[in-house]
Amino acid sequence: MSEGDSNKTHFGYKTVEADKKADLVASVFHSVAAKYDIMNDVMSFGIHRFWKRFTIETAAARPGMKVLDLAGGTGDLTAKFSHLVGERGQVVLADINDSMLKVGRTKLRDKGIVNNVSYVQANAEALPFPDNHFDIITIAFGLRNVTDKDAALRSMLRVLKPGGKLLVLEFSKPQHEMMRKAYDLYSFKILPKMGEIITKDADSYEYLAESIRMHPDQDTLKEMMQTAGFEQVDYTNMTDGIVALHKGYKF
Protein backbone atom coordinates (compact mmCIF):
# COMPACT_ATOMS: atom_id res chain seq x y z
CA MET A 1 0.00 0.00 0.00
CA SER A 2 1.65 3.22 -1.13
CA GLU A 3 1.76 6.42 0.86
CA GLY A 4 -0.56 9.26 -0.04
CA ASP A 5 -2.46 7.67 -2.95
CA SER A 6 -5.12 5.63 -1.17
CA ASN A 7 -8.00 6.15 1.20
CA LYS A 8 -6.64 3.25 3.25
CA THR A 9 -3.53 3.00 5.37
CA HIS A 10 -1.99 0.80 8.05
CA PHE A 11 -2.48 1.08 11.79
CA GLY A 12 -0.10 -1.62 12.90
CA TYR A 13 -1.20 -4.69 10.99
CA LYS A 14 -4.75 -3.40 10.60
CA THR A 15 -5.98 -1.65 7.46
CA VAL A 16 -7.96 1.48 8.35
CA GLU A 17 -9.39 4.56 6.70
CA ALA A 18 -6.54 7.03 6.20
CA ASP A 19 -8.42 9.85 7.89
CA LYS A 20 -8.90 7.70 11.02
CA LYS A 21 -5.25 6.81 11.65
CA ALA A 22 -4.30 10.07 13.36
CA ASP A 23 -7.07 9.60 15.93
CA LEU A 24 -6.06 5.99 16.53
CA VAL A 25 -2.42 6.95 17.02
CA ALA A 26 -3.50 9.79 19.30
CA SER A 27 -5.38 7.36 21.52
CA VAL A 28 -2.20 5.29 21.89
CA PHE A 29 -0.10 8.23 23.04
CA HIS A 30 -2.81 9.71 25.27
CA SER A 31 -2.76 6.33 27.01
CA VAL A 32 1.01 6.00 27.45
CA ALA A 33 2.14 9.64 27.84
CA ALA A 34 2.45 9.62 31.62
CA LYS A 35 4.69 6.52 31.63
CA TYR A 36 6.38 7.11 28.27
CA ASP A 37 9.86 7.88 29.63
CA ILE A 38 9.80 4.94 32.03
CA MET A 39 8.77 2.55 29.26
CA ASN A 40 11.51 3.85 26.97
CA ASP A 41 14.12 3.00 29.57
CA VAL A 42 12.63 -0.39 30.38
CA MET A 43 11.86 -1.64 26.89
CA SER A 44 15.19 -0.51 25.38
CA PHE A 45 17.24 -1.36 28.49
CA GLY A 46 18.32 2.28 28.42
CA ILE A 47 19.89 1.99 24.96
CA HIS A 48 17.55 4.68 23.57
CA ARG A 49 19.77 7.20 25.34
CA PHE A 50 22.73 6.12 23.20
CA TRP A 51 20.61 6.35 20.01
CA LYS A 52 19.50 9.85 20.93
CA ARG A 53 23.00 10.95 21.94
CA PHE A 54 24.31 9.85 18.53
CA THR A 55 21.50 11.83 16.90
CA ILE A 56 22.45 14.96 18.84
CA GLU A 57 26.10 14.53 17.90
CA THR A 58 25.21 14.06 14.23
CA ALA A 59 22.99 17.14 14.27
CA ALA A 60 25.98 19.29 15.28
CA ALA A 61 23.79 22.16 16.47
CA ARG A 62 25.62 25.42 17.14
CA PRO A 63 24.79 28.59 19.10
CA GLY A 64 22.15 30.71 17.40
CA MET A 65 20.60 27.92 15.34
CA LYS A 66 16.87 27.21 15.01
CA VAL A 67 15.96 23.58 15.62
CA LEU A 68 12.64 21.78 15.15
CA ASP A 69 12.25 18.68 17.33
CA LEU A 70 9.29 17.13 15.52
CA ALA A 71 7.23 14.46 17.27
CA GLY A 72 9.41 15.58 20.15
CA GLY A 73 7.16 14.07 22.80
CA THR A 74 8.62 14.34 26.26
CA GLY A 75 11.51 16.51 25.15
CA ASP A 76 14.68 14.41 25.45
CA LEU A 77 16.23 15.90 22.30
CA THR A 78 14.84 19.37 22.96
CA ALA A 79 16.60 19.51 26.32
CA LYS A 80 19.97 18.82 24.69
CA PHE A 81 19.37 21.18 21.77
CA SER A 82 18.33 23.99 24.14
CA HIS A 83 21.77 23.89 25.74
CA LEU A 84 23.61 23.68 22.41
CA VAL A 85 21.88 26.57 20.60
CA GLY A 86 22.08 28.88 23.61
CA GLU A 87 20.24 32.11 24.29
CA ARG A 88 20.48 33.31 20.70
CA GLY A 89 19.03 30.07 19.36
CA GLN A 90 15.54 28.61 19.35
CA VAL A 91 14.17 25.11 19.76
CA VAL A 92 10.58 24.25 18.84
CA LEU A 93 9.21 21.09 20.41
CA ALA A 94 6.35 20.05 18.14
CA ASP A 95 4.03 17.09 18.55
CA ILE A 96 0.58 16.26 17.24
CA ASN A 97 -0.40 14.84 20.63
CA ASP A 98 -1.27 17.34 23.34
CA SER A 99 -0.80 14.79 26.15
CA MET A 100 2.79 14.22 25.09
CA LEU A 101 3.38 17.97 24.75
CA LYS A 102 2.10 18.58 28.26
CA VAL A 103 4.41 15.94 29.70
CA GLY A 104 7.35 17.37 27.77
CA ARG A 105 6.63 20.96 28.75
CA THR A 106 6.29 20.08 32.43
CA LYS A 107 9.48 18.01 32.41
CA LEU A 108 11.58 20.70 30.74
CA ARG A 109 10.22 23.51 32.91
CA ASP A 110 10.96 21.45 36.01
CA LYS A 111 14.56 21.30 34.75
CA GLY A 112 14.63 25.07 34.30
CA ILE A 113 14.64 24.87 30.49
CA VAL A 114 12.36 27.75 29.55
CA ASN A 115 14.02 30.66 27.75
CA ASN A 116 14.70 29.33 24.26
CA VAL A 117 12.09 26.58 23.89
CA SER A 118 8.58 26.91 22.52
CA TYR A 119 5.85 24.29 22.15
CA VAL A 120 3.60 23.76 19.14
CA GLN A 121 0.91 21.17 18.53
CA ALA A 122 1.44 20.36 14.86
CA ASN A 123 0.77 17.73 12.21
CA ALA A 124 3.99 16.72 10.44
CA GLU A 125 2.13 16.55 7.13
CA ALA A 126 1.30 20.27 7.20
CA LEU A 127 3.80 22.09 9.40
CA PRO A 128 2.66 25.57 10.51
CA PHE A 129 6.03 27.26 9.99
CA PRO A 130 7.44 29.61 7.33
CA ASP A 131 9.50 28.36 4.41
CA ASN A 132 13.26 28.08 4.96
CA HIS A 133 12.98 28.57 8.72
CA PHE A 134 14.97 25.85 10.56
CA ASP A 135 18.64 24.91 10.46
CA ILE A 136 18.01 21.40 11.79
CA ILE A 137 14.92 19.18 11.96
CA THR A 138 14.83 15.96 13.95
CA ILE A 139 12.02 13.44 14.14
CA ALA A 140 12.75 10.62 16.57
CA PHE A 141 10.50 7.57 16.70
CA GLY A 142 7.66 9.55 15.14
CA LEU A 143 7.69 9.10 11.38
CA ARG A 144 6.26 5.58 11.46
CA ASN A 145 3.12 6.96 13.13
CA VAL A 146 2.48 9.53 10.38
CA THR A 147 -0.31 8.68 7.95
CA ASP A 148 1.23 10.22 4.81
CA LYS A 149 4.98 9.99 5.27
CA ASP A 150 5.70 11.43 1.83
CA ALA A 151 3.68 14.56 2.61
CA ALA A 152 5.46 14.89 5.95
CA LEU A 153 8.90 14.67 4.34
CA ARG A 154 7.93 17.33 1.78
CA SER A 155 6.64 19.54 4.60
CA MET A 156 9.91 19.16 6.49
CA LEU A 157 11.88 20.04 3.37
CA ARG A 158 9.82 23.20 2.90
CA VAL A 159 10.51 24.60 6.38
CA LEU A 160 14.19 23.65 6.36
CA LYS A 161 16.71 26.32 5.40
CA PRO A 162 18.98 25.77 2.39
CA GLY A 163 22.02 23.99 3.81
CA GLY A 164 19.94 22.58 6.65
CA LYS A 165 19.70 18.94 7.60
CA LEU A 166 16.94 16.49 8.51
CA LEU A 167 17.62 13.62 10.89
CA VAL A 168 15.13 10.75 11.10
CA LEU A 169 15.73 8.42 14.03
CA GLU A 170 13.44 5.43 13.72
CA PHE A 171 13.06 1.73 14.34
CA SER A 172 14.09 -0.23 11.28
CA LYS A 173 15.07 -3.71 10.10
CA PRO A 174 17.69 -5.81 11.91
CA GLN A 175 20.45 -6.93 9.57
CA HIS A 176 21.04 -10.49 10.78
CA GLU A 177 18.62 -13.40 10.96
CA MET A 178 19.41 -14.33 14.56
CA MET A 179 18.81 -10.77 15.68
CA ARG A 180 15.52 -10.63 13.73
CA LYS A 181 14.26 -13.79 15.43
CA ALA A 182 15.25 -12.58 18.89
CA TYR A 183 13.76 -9.16 18.20
CA ASP A 184 10.46 -10.65 17.03
CA LEU A 185 10.24 -12.80 20.15
CA TYR A 186 10.94 -9.81 22.36
CA SER A 187 8.58 -7.47 20.48
CA PHE A 188 5.52 -9.69 20.32
CA LYS A 189 5.83 -11.79 23.48
CA ILE A 190 7.64 -9.70 26.07
CA LEU A 191 7.02 -6.05 25.17
CA PRO A 192 3.19 -6.18 25.46
CA LYS A 193 3.55 -7.81 28.89
CA MET A 194 5.82 -4.94 29.97
CA GLY A 195 3.23 -2.49 28.69
CA GLU A 196 0.50 -4.23 30.67
CA ILE A 197 2.54 -4.20 33.88
CA ILE A 198 3.85 -0.63 33.68
CA THR A 199 1.12 1.28 31.80
CA LYS A 200 -1.84 -1.11 32.14
CA ASP A 201 -2.01 -1.01 28.34
CA ALA A 202 -0.73 -4.04 26.41
CA ASP A 203 -2.58 -3.04 23.23
CA SER A 204 -0.54 0.13 22.71
CA TYR A 205 2.69 -1.85 22.82
CA GLU A 206 1.31 -4.47 20.46
CA TYR A 207 0.68 -1.55 18.09
CA LEU A 208 4.26 -0.38 18.63
CA ALA A 209 5.65 -3.75 17.56
CA GLU A 210 3.34 -3.93 14.54
CA SER A 211 4.00 -0.35 13.46
CA ILE A 212 7.74 -1.01 13.44
CA ARG A 213 7.26 -4.00 11.11
CA MET A 214 5.10 -1.92 8.73
CA HIS A 215 7.54 1.01 8.60
CA PRO A 216 9.74 1.33 5.49
CA ASP A 217 13.13 -0.35 5.84
CA GLN A 218 16.41 1.52 5.63
CA ASP A 219 16.80 1.66 1.86
CA THR A 220 13.11 2.37 1.22
CA LEU A 221 13.13 5.34 3.60
CA LYS A 222 16.32 6.60 1.97
CA GLU A 223 14.55 6.54 -1.41
CA MET A 224 11.52 8.31 0.06
CA MET A 225 13.71 11.11 1.40
CA GLN A 226 15.43 11.47 -1.96
CA THR A 227 12.07 11.56 -3.76
CA ALA A 228 10.89 14.29 -1.38
CA GLY A 229 13.87 16.40 -2.45
CA PHE A 230 16.55 15.73 0.15
CA GLU A 231 20.12 15.36 -1.05
CA GLN A 232 23.17 13.44 0.16
CA VAL A 233 20.85 11.06 1.98
CA ASP A 234 22.48 8.27 3.94
CA TYR A 235 21.84 6.28 7.09
CA THR A 236 23.64 4.67 10.00
CA ASN A 237 22.43 1.43 11.54
CA MET A 238 22.55 1.08 15.31
CA THR A 239 22.08 -2.08 17.37
CA ASP A 240 22.26 -4.20 14.19
CA GLY A 241 19.65 -2.07 12.44
CA ILE A 242 16.96 -2.27 15.10
CA VAL A 243 17.26 1.50 14.85
CA ALA A 244 18.59 3.59 11.97
CA LEU A 245 19.45 7.27 11.77
CA HIS A 246 18.76 8.75 8.32
CA LYS A 247 20.33 12.07 7.37
CA GLY A 248 19.50 14.31 4.43
CA TYR A 249 20.22 17.89 3.39
CA LYS A 250 18.36 20.67 1.62
CA PHE A 251 20.46 22.56 -0.92
Curated annotation (Swiss-Prot):
Q: In which pathway does it act?
A: Quinol/quinone metabolism; menaquinone biosynthesis; menaquinol from 1,4-dihydroxy-2-naphthoate: step 2/2; Cofactor biosynthesis; ubiquinone biosynthesis
Q: EC number(s) of the enzyme?
A: 2.1.1.163, 2.1.1.201
* Pfam families, sorted: Ubie_methyltran
Q: What reactions does this protein catalyze? A: a 2-demethylmenaquinol + S-adenosyl-L-methionine = a menaquinol + S-adenosyl-L-homocysteine + H(+); a 2-methoxy-6-(all-trans-polyprenyl)benzene-1,4-diol + S-adenosyl-L-methionine = a 5-methoxy-2-methyl-3-(all-trans-polyprenyl)benzene-1,4-diol + S-adenosyl-L-homocysteine + H(+)
Name the PROSITE patterns on file: SAM_MT_UBIE, UBIE_1, UBIE_2
Q: Per the record's keyword annotation, is Transferase included, yes or no?
A: yes
- Family recorded in the similarity comment: Belongs to the class I-like SAM-binding methyltransferase superfamily. MenG/UbiE family.
| Protein name (record) | Ubiquinone/menaquinone biosynthesis C-methyltransferase UbiE
Task: Identify the species of origin.
Answer: Shewanella denitrificans (strain OS217 / ATCC BAA-1090 / DSM 15013)
Gene this chain is encoded by: ubiE
